[in-house]
Structures are given as C-alpha cells and as structure tokens.
UniProtKB/Swiss-Prot annotation:
Keywords: Amino-acid biosynthesis, Cytoplasm, Histidine biosynthesis. Its main location: cytoplasm. The lineage of its organism: Bacteria, Pseudomonadati, Pseudomonadota, Betaproteobacteria, Burkholderiales. Required for the first step of histidine biosynthesis. May allow the feedback regulation of ATP phosphoribosyltransferase activity by histidine. GO terms for molecular function: histidine-tRNA ligase activity. It is found in: Cytoplasm. The gene is hisZ. This is ATP phosphoribosyltransferase regulatory subunit.
C-alpha cells in the first residue's frame, strides 16, 4: 500500500471546516489589533540562525529547524517564534524613537511539539508594544490578549500572573546566582521543592528561605498580601507586587491567579508575565509579558511587551460558527444570470453555482438564499426546502 500521502508526526493538513474557522478568527483578531493602532508586519519564514536566536535562550534553539543556505553556505533556521523577528524589525529596520505598536500572524515550525496533541506547525498571532517601559504598556497588552480571546468566543478565562523581578531581586548580588540560575528557574517552574532546597543550599539564609517560599505563593489575588508579609521588604519586590496587583485589578472578567514560581520563558522575560487558560484545556491558550532585553542583540535595546497565541489551537476550542451564509445559483449560460451573480459577488456575497450533475454541499456553506428567475429577471429569494 502506498504511504507517500503520510505527513510527518505532529504535522497535519488544515481542512476546509477548520481553515474557515482559523481564517475567521485571524481576521477578527487582526481587525481588533488595528482598532488599537497596531501595524501589521510580515517577517520571513527563514533567517540566518544568529538573528533568529538572538536574545532568546536555549529553549528556542532546541525548537528551531536548521539547514545550510545553498547561496551563502551559512546556517539558516526556520522560525520557531515570530517575536524575535518583530523585535529585529523594530530595532533595526523601523528605528523609531517613540512608541511602536506592531502585530503579526504567520506559521512557525517546531522540531518537537510543545505538549500532548499539539501541532509542530502553530499559526502564531500576536501583538507587541515597543518604546514604553511603564506598566501602562503591559496593561494594554493584557487587555488586548483578553479581548482577542473574547473575540474567539472563549469564556471562563483564567489569567495566571507572575513577575521575574521577584526572583531577580532575591538573587541580586549573589556570587553564585549565575551558576545556579538555570537549575533554579527550572525547579521553580516545576515547583520541585526538594530540588529547590538542594540548589539553594549555598545561598545566604534570608535569600534561600525566601526562594523556597515561592512555590507556595500560588493562588488568588490574596497571595500578594501573603507575599508582602513573607518575602524580604526589598524595593524591587514591592514594585513587582504592586505591578501584579494593578494587572489583577484590570483583568476584567477573567479569574486571576498569582503564581510567583511560574517562570517559564525566563531567558528573555524581564518583568511581568501573564498566561491565559480556559476551562477543559490543559495547555495555555495565550502567553505574554515584558522582554526589554531582546532588542540588545540587534544593537538597540528598547522596552518591549507583547503576547501571542496559536490560532490553530484556539480555533479547535472556539465556539465561533464559521459556516458562511451563501446564495445558491443554478448552472446556466444565461447572460443575465452571470450579470446578477457578478453584481452580488462585487457586493461581498458568496454565490455558488451548482455544476451540472452535482448537488450543492450543504455542510460547507449555509445556503440561506437562492437566485431564481422571475419574468426574465434573476432575483434573490429565501431558500426553499428544495431547489
């Protein structure tokens, strides 16, 4: 039996019903971003590997497919994340002095899936603000992320908030911080308390005790009050907790959880981090946060904050109905019929002619009207039980 139709593991075609929903959501979200003043950019699918991985850490390196460019002999990569590309555009190509709002939508490719039943070819859509270091930009991005999920019809959103500044303040001036950082953040993200105790054993007692408290500082907004009592009264920690409190207040109808140990993506995040979940879905549906240092690799450090989500994943759980209303027309050589169809299509209507011998596909389109001839004129009428 031939197997040349098989696709690689965790790679799949997008069939019409799914593609319709994905495209509907893509349009809704990009239109939403435009109402906030975000400009669309379209980075290339591949770049030199040094550019793709600049300032992103080891995780993205492992996710990136690499190959040799036959023109230059240099190593190039297929993008695994569009965010660094947009940072490059802001830092090197646009070179604006003030605030820049950019958005994007495009496929990325991963060497390995990021979870169970997850595609290796996500369709990433997102938005970024460059040039403003204040919390106002983070508030706008959080609002936009929640609005995008609302546009997809997703309810019962849970928003998990974290801040890299808490751990950074606890590790500041520690002579062993650089040596233990990777293992420390991995243990925190996994809430692996025994590993955390082993990793922090050589830290000063005050720092060690505070870091070992972080996995337990998880729950509702009341966690912030507990954190103020239990963590050292350092100015940087106070500012981080204040930022989280403000973000929680502005979360709209989302349920807010505080998780001071959820530091996935710490390699490039530099401040607040937010992750969105919906009921019944184990994986996060959207992620965002501040990453002020990514632009440094392109010669121009700029304050930056943004979010992204996978349209394919969101479409799979969205209740949005994407079946388009359509007008059915018979197949005929009548010039007046062709003129009527052309006029309707010019007005934005979907008009589908049944080819001879082939009934219309009622599953793909919602035929609610039909073109019928009356007294030599073709007019649109509500669809009857049969055509």
């Amino acid at each position: 039996m031939p197997t040349n139709w098989l696709l690689p593991e965790s790679i799949a075609d997008v069939l019409p019903s799914e593609a319709r929903k994905i495209e509907e959501l893509r349009r809704r979200m990009l239109d939403l971003f435009r109402t906030y003043g975000y400009e669309l950019v379209m980075p290339p699918m591949l770049e030199y590997i040094e550019s793709l991985l600049s300032g992103t850490g080891h995780d993205l390196d492992l996710k990136t497919f690499k190959l040799v460019d036959q023109l230059s002999g240099r190593t190039i990569g297929l993008r695994a994340d569009i965010t660094p590309q947009v940072a490059r555009i802001d830092a090197h190509l646009l070179n604006r002095a003030g605030v820049t709002r950019l958005c994007y939508a495009g496929s990325v490719l991963h060497t390995r899936p990021s979870g169970f039943h997850v595609t290796r070819e996500p369709l990433q859509i997102g938005a970024e603000i460059y040039g403003h270091a204040g919390l106002e930009a983070d508030l706008e991005i959080q609002e936009l992320m929640l609005a995008a999920l609302s546009a997809a019809g997703l309810a019962d959103v849970r928003l998990d908030l974290c801040h890299v500044g808490v751990v950074a303040a606890l590790l500041e001036q520690s002579p062993i911080a650089a040596r233990i950082q990777d293992d420390l953040f991995t243990a925190l993200a996994a809430k692996d308390v025994p590993a955390l105790r082993a990793i922090t054993v050589d830290l000063p007692p005050a720092q060690r005790d505070a870091i070992n408290l972080l996995p337990a500082l998880y729950g509702g907004v009341d966690v912030l009050a507990r954190a103020r009592k239990q963590l050292p009264a350092l100015p940087a920690i106070g500012r981080a907790l204040d930022d989280l409190a403000t973000l929680a207040e502005r979360a709209g109808g989302a349920t807010v959880n505080i998780d001071l140990a959820d530091l996935r993506g710490y390699h490039y995040h530099s401040g607040v981090m937010f992750t969105a979940y919906v009921a019944g879905v184990p994986n996060a549906v959207a992620r965002g946060g501040r990453y002020d240092k990514v632009g440094e690799a392109f010669g121009r450090a700029r304050p930056a904050t943004g979010f992204s989500l996978d349209l394919r994943e969101v479409a799979g759980i969205s209740p949005v109905e994407a079946r388009a209303a359509a007008i059915h027309a018979p197949w005929s050589g009548d010039a007046k019929l062709r003129e009527a169809i052309a006029a309707l299509r010019a007005a934005g209507e979907i008009v589908i002619q049944s080819l001879p011998g082939h009934p219309e596909d009622l599953e793909e389109f919602a035929y609610d009207r039909q073109l019928v001839e009356e007294s030599g004129r073709w007019i649109v009428k509500p669809r009857n039980a049969s055509i």
